[in-house]
């Protein structure tokens, strides 16, 4: 599989320069221009970014996703995802470069994990081929590290330290203490489902389709919490871990007793409002515990679920009550994107780090360092 992917991509990106050595390390730059490639799941994205020690600026970005194709099949299909990445990457690269204009690129970064292994291999191979053909350095980037950067990058800044970060998405829910660019400690993670996965599965139980997190949020606005009873997972327990399997099971039993929940109407709206409140309270409780444990006064939130306004408002209220500075990934920066990958590559280029030509895809790559 990987040989076929590499061979296919080199036909698109360009040929290796005969007899010319590939750059192994970068000297420190005052200003650096990087390209980021993101293919950890079903989104295909490319971005061009300039950065220096004062901040960063997005020069060009192109993203494509086809959720309807996966939705029709009930979830993400790896083989379909690989084919989409192979088809879309060359076009998106051209589009991002055209938006950025003529710029000298110093480094390329591509997501190497965590994520779907076949999808990661496509982006990783594409990034290496692009970097080699242009004489750039190459960095394998941790997808979750990208999410740690996104709340700052969306404000035109590189990360400030120390901070506590909540990454909450369909595939990940964790709290991280970041004390430096390469100093990260996981404070808590989910013991089963991610919060975004819980939203999607509970939405499907309520007859809202899959993925249905956004539909559940919309339905919740028309309902009232407290009209039904669901548990608040892990609330008040020791540590900072999450768990959503108990909530999912309780919701299933509730729907079995009240089948009208799975049909349009007041019962469905009230159910969604209770689900929204349960997940909100769980996230707030765990984040508050992490801030108390570390004593850090800067808090960030990123990942696709942070686009949920109910979740975001609950976290904002918690931060305000605790007197904590909150940085949120804005707009498209909260979901998977290549800009955050380009930003991490820029940080490494500014630090003069060595290239990662031998890096392989790692579907379970931890963000802890």
Give the ranges of each region predicted by the language model.
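Low-acidity, Ser/Thr- and Arg-rich intrinsically disordered low-complexity segments
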Residues: 2-11, 16-18, 22
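Conserved phosphate-binding catalytic cores of ATP/NTP-utilizing and phosphoryl-transfer enzymes
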Residues: 140-164, 344
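Glycine-rich phosphate-binding/hydrolytic loop that grips phosphoryl groups
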Residues: 147-149, 329-367
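Conserved phosphate-binding/catalytic loops in two-lobed NTP-binding clefts
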Residues: 140-141, 316-341
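A contiguous, well-structured pocket-lining segment that forms one wall/lid of small-molecule binding clefts
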Residues: 61, 218-299, 308-322, 349, ...
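Short beta-strand scaffold segments in enzyme catalytic cores
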Residues: 44-50, 165, 173-177
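N-terminal beta-alpha supersecondary unit
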Residues: 32-114, 143, 147, 271
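Glycine-rich phosphate-binding loop plus the immediately following alpha-helix
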Residues: 179-222, 248, 253-256
């Amino acid at each position: 599989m990987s040989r076929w992917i590499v061979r296919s991509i080199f036909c698109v990106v360009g040929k290796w320069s005969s007899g010319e050595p590939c750059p192994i390390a970068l000297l420190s730059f005052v200003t650096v221009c990087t390209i980021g490639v993101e293919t950890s799941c079903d989104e295909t994205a490319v971005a061009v970014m300039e950065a220096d020690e004062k901040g960063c600026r997005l020069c060009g970005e192109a993203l494509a996703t086809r959720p309807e194709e996966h939705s029709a099949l009930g979830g993400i299909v790896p083989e379909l995802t690989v084919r989409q990445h192979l088809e879309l990457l060359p076009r998106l690269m051209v589009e991002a470069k055209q938006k950025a204009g003529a710029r000298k690129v110093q480094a390329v970064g591509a997501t190497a994990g965590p994520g779907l292994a076949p999808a990661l291999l496509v982006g990783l191979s594409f990034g290496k081929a692009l970097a080699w053909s242009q004489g750039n350095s190459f960095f394998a980037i941790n997808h979750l590290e990208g999410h740690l950067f996104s709340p700052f990058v969306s404000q035109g800044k590189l990360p400030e330290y120390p901070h506590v970060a909540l990454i909450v998405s369909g595939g990940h829910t964790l709290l991280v203490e970041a004390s430096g660019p390469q100093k990260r400690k996981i404070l808590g993670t989910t013991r089963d489902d991610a919060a975004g996965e819980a939203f999607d599965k509970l939405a499907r139980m309520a007859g809202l389709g899959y993925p249905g997190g956004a539909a559940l949020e919309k339905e919740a606005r028309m309902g009232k919490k407290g009209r039904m009873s669901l548990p608040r997972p892990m609330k008040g327990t020791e540590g900072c871990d999450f768990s959503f399997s108990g909530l999912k099971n309780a919701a299933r039993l509730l729907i079995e007793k009240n089948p009208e929940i799975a049909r349009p109407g007041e019962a469905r709206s009230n159910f969604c409002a209770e689900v929204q409140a349960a997940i909100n309270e769980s996230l707030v409780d765990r984040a508050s515990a992490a801030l108390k444990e570390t004593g850090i006064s800067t808090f960030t939130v990123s990942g696709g679920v942070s686009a949920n306004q109910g979740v975001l408002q609950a976290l904002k209220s918690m931060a305000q009550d605790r007197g904590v500075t909150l940085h949120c990934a804005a707009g498209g920066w909260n979901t998977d994107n290549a800009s955050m990958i380009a930003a991490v590559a820029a940080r490494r280029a500014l630090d003069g780090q060595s290239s990662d030509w031998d890096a392989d895809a790692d579907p379970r790559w931890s963000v802890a360092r």
